[in-house]
Curated annotation (Swiss-Prot):
Complexes and interactors: Homotrimer.
UniProt keyword annotation of Translocase present: no
One annotated GO biological process: isopentenyl diphosphate biosynthetic process, methylerythritol 4-phosphate pathway
PANTHER family, A to Z: 2-C-METHYL-D-ERYTHRITOL 2,4-CYCLODIPHOSPHATE SYNTHASE, CHLOROPLASTIC (PTHR43181:SF1)
Binding residue positions for a divalent metal cation: D10, H12, H44
Protein name: 2-C-methyl-D-erythritol 2,4-cyclodiphosphate synthase
Encoding gene per record: ispF
Catalyzed reactions: 4-CDP-2-C-methyl-D-erythritol 2-phosphate = 2-C-methyl-D-erythritol 2,4-cyclic diphosphate + CMP
Co-factor: note: Binds 1 divalent metal cation per subunit.
SUPFAM superfamilies linked to this entry: IpsF-like (SSF69765)
Pathway per the UniProt entry: Isoprenoid biosynthesis; isopentenyl diphosphate biosynthesis via DXP pathway; isopentenyl diphosphate from 1-deoxy-D-xylulose 5-phosphate: step 4/6
Alphabetized GO MF terms: 2-C-methyl-D-erythritol 2,4-cyclodiphosphate synthase activity; metal ion binding
Annotated function: Involved in the biosynthesis of isopentenyl diphosphate (IPP) and dimethylallyl diphosphate (DMAPP), two major building blocks of isoprenoid compounds. Catalyzes the conversion of 4-diphosphocytidyl-2-C-methyl-D-erythritol 2-phosphate (CDP-ME2P) to 2-C-methyl-D-erythritol 2,4-cyclodiphosphate (ME-CPP) with a corresponding release of cytidine 5-monophosphate (CMP).
Length: 159
């Protein structure tokens, strides 16, 4: 049995807006996130974790930010592509774990909806997906509420 684990990390700065996209859920917030696509930091980190487990680079390899067709793109496109690569390579997703790092918005109340959204996009049962949050105890750029960071891990199995 081939077991693979990949890690992903992403960060986006706050900018103008009235919401952020996190793990496929529109979360009301007094600022938005700045990015080439919809800046869904959770989906970006998770997508990179999957590509890492497959040893297939990162989002930038598959969807170059220099390509204007990806400007403002929904991050579900990237995650769906990564899931397609899992299937094409004969793997299945065993588990994924997403940790959002921010002071605000508060993630806890939204985590169940984020798990459901990711499960629907990825075509897996919600029990294979963890979404949680932590703060940086007011330290660094997330502590100063300048942006949101995310780390994700994906474990893949091939029988």
């Amino acid at each position: 049995m081939d077991i693979r684990t990949g890690n992903g990390f992403d960060v986006h700065a706050f900018g103008p807006g009235d919401h952020v996209w996190l793990c496929g859920v529109r979360v009301p917030h007094h600022r938005g996130l700045i990015g080439h696509s919809d800046a869904d930091v959770g989906m970006h980190a998770l997508t990179d974790a999957i590509y890492g487990a497959l040893a297939e680079g990162d989002i930038g390899v598959h969807f170059p930010p220099s390509d204007p067709q990806w400007k403002g793109a929904a991050s579900r496109i990237f995650l769906e592509h990564a899931m397609g690569r899992i299937a094409a390579r004969g793997f299945t997703l065993a588990n994924c774990d997403v940790t959002l790092i921010c002071e605000r918005p508060k993630i806890g109340p939204m985590a169940p909806a984020m798990r459901e959204a990711l499960a629907a996009i990825m075509g897996v049962e919600v029990g294979r997906i963890s979404v949680k949050a932590t703060t940086s105890e007011k330290l660094g750029f997330t502590g100063r509420e300048e942006g949101i960071a995310c780390i994700a891990t994906a474990t893949l199995l091939q029988a």
